[in-house]
C-alpha cells in the first residue's frame, strides 16, 4: 500500500493551498498492518533506510541481548518506598533495601554506590520496606509499629495490598542488571544497576542473557539508529512523553559490532552533563560508520528521523501548556 501525507494547520490552510498540496506530495510505501502512524511523517528515503537497517543481520535484536519486564508493583509506594528520615523515624535500618522509584533519580548510564548515597543525602525516596514474608507476631517491634501505622492510614485496604496473604510483604523476582526508562522525554536510555537496587514499575528491569556484556549494551544503546527506531516503537500521548511497554522494548535493535571499543565512562560523563550530541557523535563513529559502513549522509538521515519525530511529539507537549 502507498499513502500521501499532507500536514495542514486548519481548513483555511487547505483551501489556500488547494489540491496541489496533495499532488506535490510523494507517495510512501507502508505496511499499515504493522507500521505505526508516526512513520507517515518520514520521507520515502528515510523509510527505506530504516527498513534496510531494521533487516540488517549485523544489528542485534534486543531479545538476543536481554530480558525485560516491568518493575516492582508495591500497591502503595507511600508506604513501601521511603526516604532516610522515615527510616530513622521508625528505626527501620535493618528492614529496608535500596530501590529506585523515579527515572529522575538516574542521571547517567550507570547507577553507582556514590549515586545512591547522593540520593539518600538529597532526601529522595530510595528505601524499600521489606520485613520478609513472616507472620506479624514474628516481626520486630519496629516493623510491627510501622505496619500498624500503615494500617492506620488505610494502606492495607488498597487492592494490590489486600489481595496478598500478608499485605506488608511484596514478592520480589530477579534483581535487575539494568533499568530501561519507561517514559522518556528526549530519548530512552539503559542504566546499569551497579547498586543492585530494586526498581518500581515507573521503570523496566533488564536481565542480560548469558555471555552478554551489559556494559557494552548500555554503552551501545545510545546511538542515532537505536534512538530513531525507538521513536517508531514507543507510544506518545498528549504530554509528549514517549512511553514503552516491555513488548516494545523487546523490539529495540542495537548495533553491537565493535561495541567493545566504546568507553562507558566517557558516555556516562557526557550523559550526566546533558551532552547527548557528543555521545552520539562518538558512538555513531564506531557503531554506524566504522562497523556498519554507513555514509555521512545516511547517519545524518537517521539523525533527521530522530529529531523530526522527537520534536513533533515534544511540540504537542508545548501546545498542551
Feature annotation, model-predicted:
Residues 1-42:
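Internal, well-ordered domain-core segments that constitute the primary functional module
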Residues 2, 100, 310-314:
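Intrinsically disordered, low-complexity sequence elements enriched in Ser/Thr/Gly/Pro
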Residues 8, 14-15, 23, 246, ...:
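S-adenosyl-L-methionine
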Residues 22, 32-37, 41-80, 142, ...:
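Non-catalytic DNA-recognition/assembly elements of restriction-modification systems
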Residues 38, 46-269:
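Polybasic, glycine- and aromatic-enriched phosphate-binding surface used to engage nucleic acids
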Amino acid at each position: 500500500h502507498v499513502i500521501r501525507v499532507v500536514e495542514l494547520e486548519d481548513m483555511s490552510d487547505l483551501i489556500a493551498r488547494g489540491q496541489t498540496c496533495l499532488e506535490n506530495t510523494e507517495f510512501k510505501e507502508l505496511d499499515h498492518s504493522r507500521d505505526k502512524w508516526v512513520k507517515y511523517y518520514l520521507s520515502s528515503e528515510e523509510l527505506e533506510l530504516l527498513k534496510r537497517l531494521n533487516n540488517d543481520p549485523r544489528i542485534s535484536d534486543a531479545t538476543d541481548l536481554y530480558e525485560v519486564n516491568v518493575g516492582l508493583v508495591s500497591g502503595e509506594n507511600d508506604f513501601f518506598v521511603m526516604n532516610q528520615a522515615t527510616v530513622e523515624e521508625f528505626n527501620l535500618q535493618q528492614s529496608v533495601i535500596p530501590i529506585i522509584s523515579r527515572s529522575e533519580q538516574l542521571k547517567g548510564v550507570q547507577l553507582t554506590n556514590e549515586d545512591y548515597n547522593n540520593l539518600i543525602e538529597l532526601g529522595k525516596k530510595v528505601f524499600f520496606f521489606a520485613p520478609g514474608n513472616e507472620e506479624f507476631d514474628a516481626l520486630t517491634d519496629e516493623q510491627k509499629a510501622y505496619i500498624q501505622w500503615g494500617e492506620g492510614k488505610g494502606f492495607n485496604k488498597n487492592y494490590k495490598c489486600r489481595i496478598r496473604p500478608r499485605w506488608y510483604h511484596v514478592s520480589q523476582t530477579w534483581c535487575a542488571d539494568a533499568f530501561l526508562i519507561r517514559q522518556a522525554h528526549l530519548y530512552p536510555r539503559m542504566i546499569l544497576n551497579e547498586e543492585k537496587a530494586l526498581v518500581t514499575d515507573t521503570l523496566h528491569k533488564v536481565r542480560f542473557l548469558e555471555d552478554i556484556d551489559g556494559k557494552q549494551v548500555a554503552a551501545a544503546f545510545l546511538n542515532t539508529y537505536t534512538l530513531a527506531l525507538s521513536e517508531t516503537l514507543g507510544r506518545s500521548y498528549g504530554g509528549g512523553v514517549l512511553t514503552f511497554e516491555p513488548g516494545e522494548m523487546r523490539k529495540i535493535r542495537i548495533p553491537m559490532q565493535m561495541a567493545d571499543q566504546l568507553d562507558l565512562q566517557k558516555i556516562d560523563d557526557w550523559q550526566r552533563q546533558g551532552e547527548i550530541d557528543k555521545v552520539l557523535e562518538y558512538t555513531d563513529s564506531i557503531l554506524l560508520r566504522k562497523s556498519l559502513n554507513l555514509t555521512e549522509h545516511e547517519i545524518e538521515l537517521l539523525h533527521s528521523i530522530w529529531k523530526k519525530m522527537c520534536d513533533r511529539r515534544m511540540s504537542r507537549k508545548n501546545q498542551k501548556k
